[in-house]
Amino acid sequence: MTDAYGNDAATSTGTIADTTNNAASGAPQRAESTERLARPLIKLAKACGLATSFIDQLGTYTEISDAALVAVLKALDVDASSDEAIVRSMTQLEVENSKRLLPSTIVATTGKPTGITLNCSSDADITASIELEDGTAFGHFALLPNLNSGKPDLTIAPDLPMGYHTLTVTVDGREGKAAIIAAPARIPVPEAVAEHQRWGWMTQMYSVRSRESWGIGDYGDLKRLLADAAEKSKADFMLINPIHAGAPIPPLEPSPYLPESRRFLNVTYIRPQDIPEYATLPADVRAQVDALHDSVAARNDESTPMDINAAWEAKRPALRLIFEAGRNNKRELEFEHFKTTAGPDLDSFATWCLCFEVWGAPWGENRWFFEKTIDDPAVRQLVEEHHDLFEFNRWLQWIAAEQVNAAQQEALDHGMTLGLMQDMAVGVHGLGADAWANPERFASGGVTVGCPPDFYNQQGQDWGQPPFNPRYLEATGYQVYREMVHSMYEHAGAVRIDHVLGLFRLWWIPQGLGARNGAYVTYNHEAMLGVLAIEATRAGGMVVGEDLGTVPDYVRRILADHGVLGTDVEWFNRVDDSPNAGDPYRAPKDYRKQALASVTTHDLPPTAGYLNFAHVKLREELHLLSEPVEAFAASATAERTAMMNRLVENGYISQTVADDVEGHVQEIVEAMHAMLTDTPSLLLQAALVDGVGECRSQNQPGTSREYSNWRVPLADSSGHVVHTDEVFDLPRVQSLSAVMRREKR
């Protein structure tokens, strides 16, 4: 997640502070004092995975307040409310650790031996077994005493297959189990990508519509976009906005980065006409469906902000008509198979949807979210009374999965190397399906994720999303994360992880303390990277991590070692990572090879707009500036001048063009993309908005209702709507495609 200048909101604070005390040297303090480290609260916090200090973006050492530490510990169900409580909690933690025979989760690297020290005496009566993911036994391990510790070491042989396995250890009749995540050391680069650089498009799927759409872009449009992008521009992938599940009925949240569930799909993007049963509807029912489509179809030609609620209010009853028409035996069996495979989480999601529809949106005066659990008798009765509606919500997920799969298959059939690149949001809505059905998976007490203060957000940011509880993830072998990642690769050839630093740590904000008063909570990045490696390898796919902003070097190094591509954006890629507008930009040869390189992101105006300072004008209009507009405009001018200098220096444009940006916008946009093609980056990306000459922003960070975020339809430089079936025939898009193919300089 980035601000308007590409600084990663939650990563802009730099690094967690080194605990080595150097205050006595006379240098500015950059570590915790010996006295602070000796405090019981600090010891307890560190034992529970909290960073008790950090270095901010300015390089300033910052200590986490006691109030924040106590509140975050409470969210982890650890009581630190008093000195006595801290002692009790630390004692309880030590007792739990002493009783645990082995870790709850073990990360193994395939091809290498894995060693685990058991928490027992070597003289104990010990038995062990490993059950592989397929249910068979794996006996290639050894138990040997460790003479130094007096505890036994269990060593698993390097031929442990990739996958999710279970280790069971019995010591003197006491049993312990551990989930084993056996992953390759590195996600392999698909052969076609390793052979030579590949490029693709980025688009907000909902913004590109056809005459068959229902006011917003849908999975039918996505299918056509992928096919035409492959055939007419020779692109190898398309990155789209997150398509996680939203609310079942209006009001719908427009931001795709604030979903109700990351496990399931957004059903508002379903194309009713592409459902097989639509073709066999009785004439009168089909006429009703068509009439509902016609009631919103005229909006497909409008360039004004889209009305996603109106679109869904027309589409949903049409889908209900198709659902009620029934299915033949073959299709019914396929639906039953989908429900069985999706498992209890599908039932939980459908139940939340049902509660939302019958009892109302779970905010304001509606208290069911807080007063009813999924096991509540009233909830079970609701499902019984409205089982058809419950089944309808499960059916919608099946149809959505079918249509996304069809889009991905269309991409591959037309020659794309990767096809669809899905975007994984950071988290979910605090009142959404995931948080209600499975509260134990998340931090308790209203804690949310955000970022501490930085250059551009002096009060910090609160994204309003509850974080995963790392203790729960560890205790359950990361099952929920495994299922989420697996479901994404079912429909994609690559996954982009928004705010990839979240695999390592997240800024937790206790309710009522404000974004300034949070604390970093660390996560087992090796476990989650292991899951990503397994799922990507099985799918033959790739992983891209959004690592914009001030990300610690060790994080980028670990991600690269695991085969996760970074993200390089031209507008943010200055020499020595300088944050100062006007400082020189990197030469293309200095970009990372293991990266997805692009000119822009969805948080910036399209490049044509950025070159014309659309971001300055918009921020001034919305009163978002914390400095005089003249100062912000001067900074933007210096930034543009520095980019023109880089383009001139490397021969992409002449000085004459650089001196007249407004008169050569398309030429400069293409020059910036030509510079991309001279980088060593494995993947390159062009934004479809840059292809058509759009100037309007899809999203303005720092706003909610002040701007039409995530509702701007695709239009050209003249403001005319561009439809799905014509976009890749436009001369401007064809020209940019030729640049990306290195056929035009």
Predicted regions and their residues:
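Conserved alpha/beta catalytic core and glycan-binding cleft of carbohydrate-active enzymes
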Residues: 334, 547, 551-695
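Hydrophobic faces of well-ordered beta-strands that scaffold small-molecule active sites
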Residues: 199-203, 236-240, 420-422, 495, ...
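The substrate-binding groove and active-site-proximal loops of carbohydrate-active enzymes
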Residues: 206-220, 268, 385-398, 461-479, ...
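Conserved, mostly hydrophobic/aromatic
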Residues: 45, 165, 229, 352, ...
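Acidic, His- and aromatic-enriched active-site or binding-groove loops in soluble protein domains
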Residues: 254-281, 434-459, 518-529, 564-576
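Acidic/aromatic-lined carbohydrate-recognition and catalytic surfaces
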Residues: 75-111, 123, 129-141, 145-152, ...
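Substrate-binding/active-site clefts of carbohydrate-active enzymes
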Residues: 417-480, 484-487, 491, 506-522
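Active-site neighborhood of glycoside hydrolase catalytic domains
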Residues: 396-413, 477-564
